[in-house]
Amino acid sequence: MNDLITLAQAHCQPREKKEHKLGQARLAELLPQVPGWELSNNGHALTRTFRFDNYYRTLAFVNALAFIAHCEDHHPDMSVHYGRAVVCFSTHKIGGISENDFICAAKTSALYEQGI
């Protein structure tokens, strides 16, 4: 990925081979670029909880995120609750985290910051 392009502006690329799984050094480099996200599932996923005033806003966010996931062809695991949504990105085909997960995490954070 070109370092001049922010994660939120980048687009997902096919990443189906084990060599696309990010190592610890690259994870440490990218994690500060997605504030609020943390490594989960023993370092195999990125997770963040988003909080909302009510269930309607939670579902509006989840539906908007579904559209982004569809456009990027990279889909998170989500759990939806009253006033919060937990979003978890992982590249299942490689058994860990790829740059696609960071791209989608950044896009998800940008969506949240827009007040959706």
UniProtKB/Swiss-Prot annotation:
UniProt xrefs under InterPro entries: PCD_sf, Pterin_deHydtase
SUPFAM superfamilies hit by this protein: PCD-like
PANTHER family, per the entry: PTERIN-4-ALPHA-CARBINOLAMINE DEHYDRATASE
Catalysed reactions, as listed in the record: (4aS,6R)-4a-hydroxy-L-erythro-5,6,7,8-tetrahydrobiopterin = (6R)-L-erythro-6,7-dihydrobiopterin + H2O
Protein name according to UniProt: Putative pterin-4-alpha-carbinolamine dehydratase
Domain of life: Bacteria
Keyword annotations of the record: Lyase
Protein's UniProt keywords contain Coiled coil: no
UniProt EC number: 4.2.1.96
Gene3D superfamilies registered for this protein in UniProt: Transcriptional coactivator/pterin dehydratase
Pfam families per UniProt: Pterin_4a (PF01329)
